[in-house]
Amino acid sequence: MKIHIVQKGDSLWKIAEKYGVDVEEVKKLNTQLSNPDLIMPGMKIKVPSEGVPVRKEPKAGKSPAAGSVKQEHPYAKEKPKSVVDVEDTKPKEKKSMPYVPPMPNLQENVYPEADVNDYYDMKQLFQPWSPPKPEEPKKHHDGNMDHMYHMQDQFPQQEAMSNMENANYPNMPNMPKAPEVGGIEEENVHHTVPNMPMPAVQPYYHYPAHFVPCPVPVSPILPGSGLCYPYYPAQAYPMHPMHGYQPGFVSPQYDPGYENQHHENSHHGHYGSYGAPQYASPAYGSPYGHMPYGPYYGTPQVMGAYQPAAAHGYMPYKDHDDCGCDGDHQPYFSAPGHSGMGAYGSPNMPYGTANPNPNPYSAGVSMPMTNQPSVNQMFGRPEEENE
């Protein structure tokens, strides 16, 4: 037995003819073939090796012998079946249209016709039935004519107003036109009242509120008791006011003759009055019975401290040097001389300032002032001086 590997285009009929064997024998040996008529390349076919006689077909052109029976071809049953093309009987699916929802009926709202005048109120529903009123007979006036028809004959109808446009009106005289002034628009012209001088208004007088100025804190080693400064006479003329403020006017009859000097703790805007006398009030007299103090603060004679300034118009003069014993020697005031500002000459500063205006009650010649405390004794305590 031989094994034949199927090549492309081979069949069992060709393989049996090649090896000279019967086809039926080849089919019997190859029982693994489910369809002997269909073999694929690469398959192994078993072929018998024993010689099997092969029947030869008669040659064409020679007539068969008489009485010979025509035998059927042994491979007639093994002829390949004709391939029949089978059409697909499955019906084709029709293309379905997309689902479109039905459109609603866009008809206008149809309202039933009803009689508008045929309506009933709630009051009419509950009213009792009443019979209809009988119709009154109409009165006919045969001989009476309306007097208004006769009035039309007395007043004839007026003419139509259509021809009033063509009526002749009296001609108006031509008035001269006012000359135009260039550069001025009437809309932008503002009528203003000219500035008229206002009458003078009397100043408002108010009673001044006094307060005691406190001294600048100093070292306890320095002389002085640290008490508040006593009152002093008011200025003959007002001090220089601060910018943006008006001086306070005080009535002369209510002014006690004292006012408070500006110092670093002061925040009041009070200034001196006009014509205040330069004398001490009995209620605010000097605590030591001396002359009232001048319009300046005396500062302790310490190196680096502010130097006191004399009254405006008087220069201090001493006939002898100070011995330092705190005596009652008082300086003499010389003839009036215009002195400048103090060491720190600002009228609004509490220390080292001078009275910018001379005392109206002082004499023009130099005169001694008795019982006037010295600069160093102005703020001392009496009990310390007696010791």
UniProtKB/Swiss-Prot annotation:
GO terms for molecular function: ATPase binding; lytic endotransglycosylase activity. Residues 70-96 have a biased composition (Basic and acidic residues). Residues 2-47 form the LysM domain. GO terms for biological process: sporulation resulting in formation of a cellular spore. Induction: Transcribed by SigE at time T2 of sporulation. InterPro entries: LysM_dom, LysM_dom_sf, Spore_coat_assembly_SafA. It is found in: Spore cortex. GO terms for cellular component: endospore cortex. Several coat proteins are extracted in reduced amounts from SafA mutant spores, one of which is CotG. SafA mutant spores have abnormal coat layers and have lost their resistance to lysozyme. Their response to L-alanine suggest that they have a defect at a late stage of spore germination. Their response to AGFK also suggests that they have an additional defect at a early stage of spore germination. The mutation of SafA has no effect on vegetative growth and spore resistance to heat and chloroform. This is SpoIVD-associated factor A. The gene is safA.
